[in-house]
Amino acid sequence: MPIKIPTELPAFKVLSNENIFVMNDSRAKTQDIRPLKIAILNLMPKKILAENQLLRHLSNTPLQVEVKLIQTKSYVSQNTPIEHLEKFYTYFDDIKEEKFDGLIITGAPVEQMEFEDITYWNELTEIMEWSKSNIFSTLHICWGAQAGLYYHYNIPKYKLENKISGVFSHWVNDENADLTRGLDDVFHVPHSRHTEVKKEDINKISELEILSESKEAGIFIVATKNRRKIFFMGHPEYDRNTLKEEYLRDREKGDDVEIPQNYFVDNDINSTPKFTWRGSSNIIFGNWLNYCVYQNTPYDINEISE
């Protein structure tokens, strides 16, 4: 979908240079169709980078997508210019009377903390509760997925002995499932986390199903059977160099971290990482937008309800 974003947003230039179709407001108004309204609750520290990654995957298909960027009020990002936040972001209080076709809740580097100890936890739970009646399909990513499973289903996270970091092979559990339609028998997805959720906990919830998993990385995609809530345990949105940048950051902090698996050529951190998940990621995000959102959301957005 051509994505409707402000011309001044850094992602506009980045995506245009990649030959991805982006649309400014004036052009969007000349198309007599209802755009999909997608909100992004961006909890990542480097918000501009996360914007670029997610908007890239929401772009370049036949329909319009109108994006609203949301930041938390209870915690102000220390890694994104305040001018950028003031210009392009809004607060939940400003949009909570609206309805959206989709919501993306990103990951955040807070997974080793207890959920209730996180500064913005109360605000996040208010948003997740609101999403049940104001969002048609909510996509939770990595820590956002763990937070969503904990809030909605009381599914805990467990600390791993060693951080999972790398690009891992996955399989599809149901080849007829809409979210995984078109994926190869074996496909790759990056993971980067210190915690996990367990299969036996998810299997106790009849409303949930595990659509994809990995021998090395564990569960990847969990979804409600009606697709109103989707949970990605990995990071299909990551760019080629994101895992590298995270590894170098952790090493500079003095953390005892291993080189991301199946990523660098011959484990040489000076090499250009292998980008082996771009195709599968495009399919996964496209499937969410098409099958979980566009094909089922009501034409009158005000009809969205729990």
UniProtKB/Swiss-Prot annotation:
Substrate binds at residues 163, 192, 249. It is found in: Cytoplasm. Its EC number is 2.3.1.31. GO terms for molecular function: homoserine O-acetyltransferase activity; homoserine O-succinyltransferase activity. It holds the Pfam family HTS. InterPro entries: Class_I_gatase-like (IPR029062), HST_MetA (IPR005697), MetA_family (IPR033752). GO terms for biological process: L-methionine biosynthetic process from homoserine via O-succinyl-L-homoserine and cystathionine. Pathway: Amino-acid biosynthesis; L-methionine biosynthesis via de novo pathway; O-acetyl-L-homoserine from L-homoserine: step 1/1. It catalyses: L-homoserine + acetyl-CoA = O-acetyl-L-homoserine + CoA. Its main location: cytoplasm. GO terms for cellular component: cytoplasm. The record marks 192 as: Important for substrate specificity. Keywords: Acyltransferase, Amino-acid biosynthesis, Cytoplasm, Methionine biosynthesis, Transferase. The record marks 111 as: Important for acyl-CoA specificity. It comes from the Bacteria. The active site is at residues 142, 235, 237. Disulfide bonds: none annotated. PANTHER family: HOMOSERINE O-SUCCINYLTRANSFERASE. Transfers an acetyl group from acetyl-CoA to L-homoserine, forming acetyl-L-homoserine. Belongs to the MetA family. This is Homoserine O-acetyltransferase. It comes from Clostridium botulinum (strain Alaska E43 / Type E3).
